[in-house]
Amino acid sequence: YIPPEKLRQAASLRWLACASSGVEQYLGEYLYAAPGVILTNSAGAYGITISEHIITTLLMLLRRIPEYYDVVHQHQWKDLGRIRSIYGSVITVVGTGDIGTAFAQRAKALGAAHIRGVHRTNKVLPRCFDESYAVEDLDFALAGADIVVLCVPGTKETEHLITRERLGLLKKTSVLINVGRGSVLDQDALMEVLNSGKIAGAALDVTNPEPLPPEHPLWNTKNLIITPHVSGNMSLDITCDIDVNMFCDNL
């Protein structure tokens, strides 16, 4: 992250190449000392690593791994009962770019029964999606979903896209994953539905704010997995290779 005051001091800056998909913090001519600065992102570099992170946290929730973690650390040998599977599930993916599509492909390979894609454009979705919804029809796409995955960037249009009312459309057995931006989700409402058992679980790789303060109640929310915005970092070799190749192509 480059602070705005640093950007305003860079009088010779002509191109800002970001090694991230989201660049909302760098939008706006007022940020730069000189007009006409070219801004590029790395959308397309993170599908592999973030989709694998989604699958990891999703399986942890479906198989109740966080609950078993607590059980074994209390030195108990206890079967918690029913678990669930990606196989046969109905999945709603909000955001059908590189990340959402990479996840949908992997979920389909694991036997997901029906995958809905929610998008902001009228593009034709890849075959891994069984159904296509415009963002205006999000309520219909959420209804009846076993799994909801959020992969959208943080913009004015996506702020609190998942409201208290929309969380209320989910089933008691539903799980939600957010790898987009923390601003997309009403976190207070999420804490309420998790603590009251109105949905089964959630995993957040992004929060609002970031870093999440140590005293924030989100840390103590039931059936919630939190990771510190690491699903799409540069620690996977293939991600670095793709990112460097994209930079060279842009150059």
Descriptions of predicted regions:
Residues 37-53, 67, 210-251:
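C-terminal helix-to-coil terminal segments
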Residues 5-10, 26-34, 121-130, 213-220:
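Short loop/helix-cap segments at secondary-structure boundaries that form the rim of catalytic
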Residues 109-113, 200:
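Conserved S-adenosyl-L-methionine
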Residues 36, 87-90, 112, 164, ...:
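Phosphate-coordination loops involved in phosphoryl transfer and adenosine-cofactor binding
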Residues 68-102:
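Glycine-rich NAD(P)-binding loop of Rossmann-like domains
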Residues 1-69:
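Phosphate/diphosphate ligand-binding glycine-rich loop within oxidoreductases
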Residues 122-217:
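Rossmann-like adenosine-cofactor binding region
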Residues 1, 19, 151-154, 178-179, ...:
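Short, well-ordered coil/turn residues at beta-beta hairpins
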